[in-house]
């Protein structure tokens, strides 16, 4: 075992350890939410996950962005096959260890990876152009200023460098093999789809020492970019690469638009309607140290854990905001910003608890310090955001819980809704006329 193998093993251990620590922090943040059971109908959940998360079925609702994303997605998935060999070579000191064993299938796999890498490169440039040159409107909203905009570009730059490293590694190795200097077994061309051309026409004619250097630069560059990419993900919206699968699996299976009832309210209503219930019975005393349950949500700790997982899964693609009628008509509401705010607040509370303990209290809350009442009441409850999300995120659940808190805990409600509620109570309709006049329209 040489020094390069030791360096690789240390890099491997350090990279995965750092990644695991950060993922554990995020899982802890998600667990700040209240408990909710999303384990029913596992078969349907698994099929939905395969169709939506793995099959990318909702991405192609917008064909251009959808197809470009699928190019990058397929390249990412298939490249992991080659990464297994790279890890094996790095640990053992071998060179293309699987080539002799797999034979022609190895050539097919590497060729497929190279073709997909070219398509991913095309998609990368297209996405950079859409964000920075064409300035697609949904990427220019106020919540995308600063870090979110930079984050979207950084990952695309990393994608470009990673693909260049792959082609440098394979192209230089092809040129070495053509002159009988490659460390890989056998001789002659690898017959890879792209790098065989590069090896002959781009790297051909270079001296052997330069080719060996370029091959090693490509190999180590590939490794460094993989670990850099992996450990950048916990700080990036691109963490959806991993969270999309559990997020879709645990998504709400109820029909879109069906709102959940609050258990505490349902319990009270059932008790009121029970003819055998004692109307003078005192409420059950709370356990010692327990806090009365809130109506709705004021902070992320009042949401359920799935809402917070939704926030960490958010791709910031803006399809929700782009389809939101409130946002389209100039209202302050942006469903994407709602999810970003939930994630930021969960991070803030999680970091505070890790530093100061469970009694951490910064005097802030999700409602008020991150999301304003104006945003909450701008929502029309149309579910356009839920319908458009490619990974089944549900901003409406969060908005509804924030509204419930405002109405039921703080008695804050727009005057228009006060009038409507009064009319419903008195007239059994939102409009201010007597129920006896309902059929007068037929006489007009």
Segments (PLM) and residue ranges:
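Short acidic (Asp/Glu) and glycine-rich catalytic loops that position anionic groups and cofactors
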Residues: 25-30, 223-226, 316-322, 379-383, ...
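Acidic, Ser/Thr-rich low-complexity segments on the non-lumenal side of membrane proteins
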Residues: 51-66, 262-315, 319-323, 328
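Flexible gly/pro/ser-rich segments immediately N-terminal to CXXCH heme-c attachment motifs
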Residues: 112, 146-147, 210-220, 303-315, ...
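Membrane-embedded alpha-helical bundles of multi-pass integral membrane proteins
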Residues: 1-280
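Ferredoxin-type iron-sulfur electron-transfer modules in oxidoreductases and energy-metabolism complexes
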Residues: 282-311, 327-433
């Amino acid at each position: 075992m040489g020094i390069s193998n030791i360096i690789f093993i240390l890099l491997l251990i350090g990279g995965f350890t750092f990644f695991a620590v950060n993922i554990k922090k995020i899982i802890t943040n998600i667990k700040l939410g209240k408990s909710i059971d999303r384990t029913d109908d596992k078969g349907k959940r698994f099929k939905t996950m395969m169709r939506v998360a793995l099959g990318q079925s909702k991405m192609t609702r917008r064909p251009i962005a959808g197809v470009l994303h699928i190019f990058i997605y397929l390249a990412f998935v298939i490249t992991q096959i080659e990464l297994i060999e790279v890890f094996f070579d790095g640990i053992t000191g071998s060179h293309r260890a699987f080539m002799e064993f797999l034979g022609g299938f190895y050539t097919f796999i590497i060729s497929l990876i190279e073709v997909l890498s070219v398509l991913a490169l095309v998609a990368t440039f297209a996405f950079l152009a859409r964000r920075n040159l064409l300035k697609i409107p949904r990427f220019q909203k106020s919540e995308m200023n600063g870090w979110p905009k930079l984050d979207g570009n950084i990952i695309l730059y990393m994608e470009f460098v990673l693909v260049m490293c792959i082609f440098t590694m394979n192209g230089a190795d092809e040129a070495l093999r053509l002159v009988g200097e490659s460390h890989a077994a056998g001789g002659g061309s690898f017959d890879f789809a792209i790098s065989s051309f590069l090896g002959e026409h781009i790297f051909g004619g270079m001296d052997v020492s330069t080719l060996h250097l370029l091959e090693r630069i490509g190999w180590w560059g590939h490794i460094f970019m993989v670990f850099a990419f992996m450990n950048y993900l916990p700080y990036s919206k691109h963490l959806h690469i991993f969270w999309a699968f559990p997020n879709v699996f645990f998504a709400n299976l109820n029909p879109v638009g069906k709102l959940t009832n609050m258990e505490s309210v349902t319990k009270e209503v059932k008790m009121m309607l029970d003819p055998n219930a004692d109307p003078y019975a005192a409420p059950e005393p709370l356990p010692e140290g327990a806090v009365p349950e809130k109506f709705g949500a004021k902070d992320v700790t009042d949401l359920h854990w799935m809402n917070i997982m939704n926030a960490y899964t958010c791709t910031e693609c803006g399809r929700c905001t782009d389809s939101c009628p409130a946002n389209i008509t100039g209202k302050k509401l942006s469903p994407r910003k709602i999810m970003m705010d939930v994630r930021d607040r969960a991070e803030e509370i999680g970091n505070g608890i890790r530093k100061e303990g469970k009694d951490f209290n910064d005097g802030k809350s999700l409602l008020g310090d991150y999301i304003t009442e104006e945003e909450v009441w701008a929502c029309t409850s149309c579910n356009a955001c839920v319908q458009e999300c490619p990974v089944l995120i549900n901003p409406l659940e969060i908005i509804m819980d924030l509204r419930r808190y405002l109405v039921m805990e703080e008695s804050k409600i727009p005057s228009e809704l006060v009038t409507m509620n009064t009319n419903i109570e008195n007239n059994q309709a939102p409009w201010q006329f007597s129920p006896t006049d309902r059929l007068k329209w037929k006489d007009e």
